[in-house]
Amino acid sequence: MRNMQEKGVSEKEILEELKKYRSLDLKYEDGNIFGSMCSNVLPITRKIVDIFLETNLGDPGLFKGTKLLEEKAVALLGSLLNNKDAYGHIVSGGTEANLMALRCIKNIWREKRRKGLSKNEHPKIIVPITAHFSFEKGREMMDLEYIYAPIKEDYTIDEKFVKDAVEDYDVDGIIGIAGTTELGTIDNIEELSKIAKENNIYIHVDAAFGGLVIPFLDDKYKKKGVNYKFDFSLGVDSITIDPHKMGHCPIPSGGILFKDIGYKRYLDVDAPYLTETRQATILGTRVGFGGACTYAVLRYLGREGQRKIVNECMENTLYLYKKLKENNFKPVIEPILNIVAIEDEDYKEVCKKLRDRGIYVSVCNCVKALRIVVMPHIKREHIDNFIEILNSIKRD
C-alpha cells in the first residue's frame, strides 16, 4: 500500500496486517540474536509504556509528573555513578548522549575562544580508535577535529599517547570508553581523568553498555590488571549510560549525566513557545516512558536484582568462552564484560553463513573476529546450538 486510501480499514484488519510484518522480525527469546546490545524488556515496563505513552518530555511544563520521574531516574543513575549532584536526561540512546557531551565540549571551546584562551580553529578532541560510530557523526555535524588515539595490546586506549598529545596540542576534550562496543574492554579512565584534570581538559566517558554492568560485577568476574573505575568519583565531566541496553528498559531509553547542573548552560537553547523556555537535549520531542521505565526498573530490581542479572550474563559468557576453547576456536581476549570475540580470518564469510542458518552475530573492526554479546536472553542451550552450528560451518 503506497497511497493512502480514502476510507479507513477496521482495527482487526490493520492489526492482522501488522502482525504479519512483525512475524518477519527476529525475537530475542528465540535465542538467535547474538550480536545485539539490547534484549528483552522487563514485563513491568510494558505496563509503564501504556501509562506514559502520551507524554512528552520535550514540553515538561505539560507533563510535570513525567519530568519528575526523569529527574528521579537521573538521580538513581547518579547514585550508581557516585554522584548525588548529577544533572542529566533520559534521551534516545547512546548516540544522542555522546552528541550532547560533544556539544558541551564545543560550547566550552567557544567560550574559551571568546575570552582569547584558545587559538584552535576547531575543538580538538582525543578519541580512541575503538570509539562508537556516534563520535564520527558528531565530528561531521559539529566540525570537530579529532586526534585518534591508538590502542595497546589489551585493546584499551594508549594513555602515553594521550599524555604526549596533551603536551603537543591544545586539547579541548578526551573521550574514554568503559565497555567498548566490539570487545567490552575498559579504558584506564582513572589515568585519563588524571591527565584531563591536570591540564583543565573536559573528559567524557562512554559507558553506554558498561555503565549498568561494571557497578554490579562480583569480584570473581574481575580480571587482574583491569582498572574497573570509571565514574564521577574520578572527576570526569560526563558519562553516557543506556538503560535500554543492560538496564532492561524499552527503546528509546538512553542516558547522559553531567557532573552538576553547571554544564546545562553549555547545552541550553531558547525554546520560547514551550512551557519551559530553555531546552538542552538534541531531540525536541522526547518520549516520557523512557524516564519512567528507567526509574521503575531501578527501583523494582534494586542493586541485588540487577547484580543477579549481570552475574548470570557473566556466567553464560564464561561458559561460551570455555566452550569455544574446548572446540579449538580462539577468543580474542578473556572476557572483561559479557562480550566475546572469536578470531577468524574469514569472519565476514562466517558471519554470512551463520545468518543463512538463522544465527545473527556481528563482527569487529579492530580485529578480524566475530562478536557475540551475551545478553539476558541468551541461555546455555542457545550457546550450545551456536557452537554446534559454528562447528558445522567450519567443517564445510
Swiss-Prot record:
Keyword Lyase: yes
Entry annotated with the keyword Acetylation: no
Entry's EC annotation: 4.1.1.11, 4.1.1.25
Residues recorded as bearing N6-(pyridoxal phosphate)lysine in the entry: K245
One Pfam family named in its UniProt record: Pyridoxal_deC
Cofactors (names): pyridoxal 5'-phosphate
Thermal dependence of function as given in the entry: Thermostable. Retains full tyrosine decarboxylase activity after heating at 100 degrees Celsius for 10 minutes and 42% of its activity after 10 minutes at 110 degrees Celsius. Inactive after 10 minutes at 121 degrees Celsius.
Single GO biological process annotation from the record: methanofuran biosynthetic process
HAMAP family assigned to the protein according to its UniProt record, in alphabetical order: MfnA_decarbox (MF_01610)
Family stated for the protein in its record: Belongs to the group II decarboxylase family. MfnA subfamily.
Function in brief: Catalyzes the decarboxylation of L-tyrosine to produce tyramine for methanofuran biosynthesis. Can also catalyze the decarboxylation of L-aspartate to produce beta-alanine for coenzyme A (CoA) biosynthesis.
Descriptive protein name: L-tyrosine/L-aspartate decarboxylase
Source species of the chain: Methanocaldococcus jannaschii (strain ATCC 43067 / DSM 2661 / JAL-1 / JCM 10045 / NBRC 100440) (Methanococcus jannaschii)
